[in-house]
Amino acid sequence: MYNINDAIYASRLLNIPFNKFSIEDFLEGINIESEHGSINELTNVTNDDLIITSKIALAHLNEYPNYYNKEYGLKKYEEFLKTKLNNVKN
């Protein structure tokens, strides 16, 4: 698990302005995107590199600043779409 100091370090290297999302959102993203590391050798693309992992999180946050928000981010949107698709099938 990465911590706030890791997020601050990465954000400084990547010159992130934090005008559309917070450092906490960024940290949440880094920790979620660590799934692309050595946790699974078949899907390891970052090799647990903080900066590469941070770039993945940053890419998602740049296109959708609420991407990692648990209340209304991507996960909730996916659940909404799944419900809609299930209703269409029935």
Give the residues covered by each predicted segment.
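Long, charged low-complexity interaction segments
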Residues: 1-17
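Short amphipathic alpha-helical segments that mediate assembly, nucleic-acid/protein binding
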Residues: 4-7, 23-25, 35, 54, ...
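Short, flexible helical or helix-coil boundary motifs
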Residues: 14, 33-37, 64, 84, ...
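Charged, low-complexity interaction regions
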Residues: 17-20, 39-45
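N-terminal alpha-helical modules
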Residues: 19-22, 27-29, 68
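A short, structured beta-strand/loop element
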Residues: 29-34, 41
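Amphipathic alpha-helical packing elements
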Residues: 44-79
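Membrane-interface alpha-helices
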Residues: 75-89
